[in-house]
Amino acid sequence: MARKYDLISELYNRTCKTVVSNPQNWQAFLASACRNYKLRYDEQLLVYAQRPDATAVLEIEQWNKIFGRWVNRGARGIAVFADENRSRQRLTHYFDISDTHESRYSRTVPIWDMRQEYEADVIETLESTFGEIENKSSLAEAIMGAARNAAEDNIPDYLQDLYYATEGSSFEEVEEDIVAFIYKNVVTNSVAYMMMSRLGVDTDGYFELDDFRDVTNFNTQETLNALGFATSDIAEMGLTEISKTITALNRQNRIIVGQDRNEYN
């Protein structure tokens, strides 16, 4: 296990460098991370490195006990660090839903999808979660406004960590107010990109690569952690509330469909 831990640590270090080497790589990571938004940032990074197409990951015991699904013979787990600070030097292994199959005890895995008819409700959820949104002309604009509000409210909780981590990075000789401006801008765009990706919004039609050009400044593991954890944490806040809204709407629709069928019969 020690040898595998070392290999995964090396993979993590390489991936940290790769994802900020250019805007496209960072966007690819965000598009992967949005599908497993409840994971820690460091877990999302390792899932991206090993299975960028994973849509829903759990440990084998959770697949068995919670959803009655069994992992396919020969399936390879996705190795992640057991704890954020890596103090125990242990790995946890996740399996994607595509690595599992149903049993007689299976329960539905609640993977939600955005529908056009849910747009008004989702925008209302974003506003109730992150505050008043000025531009609600489209779902993309509402998400962008929510991301700005969220960054404004939450960036101070992470900014000090970035200030402490600038040594040896592109930010080392940069004034703190400029560092803060760049940080807030990249986090805002990254949170919006994650939420848009999960909701099926055309990110290419909204963002340009130039919107993420400053990600290359987060060129040490410490500065990238400050970016990654803030982005992941804030995006999770929004996506968790959106998930509740969409799940409730899906449940209402099933009830209505059931009533219609009863009336027809």
Could you describe each region identified by the protein language model?
Residues 1-265:
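N-terminal accessory/interface modules of nucleic-acid-binding and processing proteins
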